[in-house]
């Protein structure tokens, strides 16, 4: 498996970060690597949504997602746990899919991880995805967050957008790779 770098975007008080080109039939698998996504607002979820080929340039608000989320966490005060995160699941919803819990905006808090999107150019199958993130929570905990699901769309998916559910992305970089 080799990663071929396609594009990068860097936040600077950005409302969203999007890739509107580069996702096509060249690769069957695309990875998005997130480095220190730091929110301007405290206690916010980092999330994504896609545009199908019939809505390119649209509002990233029509593709239906179904997903499941699990997390492990550890507070600085020494409490820890493992849980299913039902509030982050989507069930045939056009909402943005959460990739993290509530990220803090202290100077040392951020979220980093990888989202993998499978066969986005397929016009036969729905689009599966997996994500794994580590984030620094607003109340001084670290979290290992796993999300998996599918985009219930048989049209190609050429665009993807990322944002925090409230406020701007203060800083951070997203790199898009094709997987060979």
Question: Predicted regions span which residues?
Answer:
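Surface-exposed molecular-recognition determinants
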Residues: 1-180
